[in-house]
């Protein structure tokens, strides 16, 4: 039967990749997915050859700084197209990488694991790549906090406090709400060389507060208070990720791509909440400039298929 396939390949291939950052090497575990497009004349692909081709591509590419996982994805995609005689290849890589952090008050050194993400697509004539990160934080719910504020104001009024004093008290005292651990993901599709830790900062700062593996009591107090002074909806985090990315990288071209995604894990519900935004830089800039709805939200798959 002569019928082309949209994709055929392998998923979940585990490889150890040596990466350099800050003058030291780190051996990290990477998970690789790879697919190729098949034209009607091709019966199939050599599935068993994919891991071998990954090894060849990794050996050929000297990985420099930590975020170059996207360059590796692009190199593998090109290698697969050439060696498998495919029309097109798409590669996705996810690697867990340790970064050093200092806690906000005591300065305690702590190691946090973040996900470095690389996506690339290659045809016989061109290629595109995205660099991404995934990081966790905490979001304090603004809605519940508003309810607590209203009730606190009512009780203070019943206790005889003047309105001006009530407002002052509510400004000074952190207000309770329910918290959500959040996972933010940010992808940028560009030829620019970006620093992955800068992307992690953008993701973490879009939430109410970063979180840390180790915390002394003064640090714990700071994180909790800071989060409750910066309540965020899941939608707020996505909008902040997009805006911060465009502000930080003004040299992005209009045809470059941004995708931001936030998942908050609920504590008082049995469901979780999600928001995301994707599109070309030009689409996002235009919408932020005029405040009107953009009729086009270019999706990741469409952006990758432009090659």
Regions inferred by a protein language model and the residue ranges of each:
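N-terminal intrinsically disordered, cationic/polar leader segments
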Residues: 1-307
């Amino acid at each position: 039967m002569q019928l082309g396939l949209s994709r055929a390949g392998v998923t979940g291939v585990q490889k150890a990749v040596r990466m350099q950052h800050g003058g030291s090497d780190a051996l990290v575990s990477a998970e690789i997915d790879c697919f190729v497009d098949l034209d009607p004349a091709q019966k199939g692909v050599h599935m068993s050859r994919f891991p071998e081709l990954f090894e060849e591509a990794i050996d050929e590419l000297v990985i420099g700084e930590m975020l170059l996982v996207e360059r590796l994805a692009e190199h593998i995609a090109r290698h697969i197209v050439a060696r498998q005689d495919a029309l097109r290849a798409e590669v996705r890589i996810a690697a867990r990488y340790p970064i050093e952090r200092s806690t906000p008050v005591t300065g305690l050194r702590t190691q946090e694991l973040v996900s470095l993400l690389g996506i690339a697509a290659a045809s016989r004539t061109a290629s595109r790549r995205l660099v991404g990160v995934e990081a966790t934080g905490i979001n304090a719910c603004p809605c519940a906090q508003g309810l607590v504020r209203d009730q606190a104001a009512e009780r203070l009024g019943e206790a005889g406090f003047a309105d001006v004093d009530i407002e002052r008290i509510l400004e000074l005292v952190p207000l309770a709400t329910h918290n959500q651990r959040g996972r933010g993901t940010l992808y940028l599709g560009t030829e620019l060389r970006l620093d992955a830790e800068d992307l992690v900062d953008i993701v973490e700062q879009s939430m109410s507060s970063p979180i840390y593996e180790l915390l002394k009591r003064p640090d714990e107090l700071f994180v909790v208070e800071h989060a409750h002074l910066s309540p965020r909806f899941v939608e707020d985090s996505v909008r902040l990720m997009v805006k911060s990315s465009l502000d930080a990288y003004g040299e992005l071209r209009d045809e470059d791509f941004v995708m931001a995604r936030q998942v908050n894990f609920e504590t008082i519900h049995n469901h979780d909440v999600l928001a995301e935004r994707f599109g070309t830089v030009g689409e996002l800039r235009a919408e932020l400039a005029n405040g009107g709805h953009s009729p086009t939200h270019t999706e990741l798959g469409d952006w990758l298929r432009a090659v």
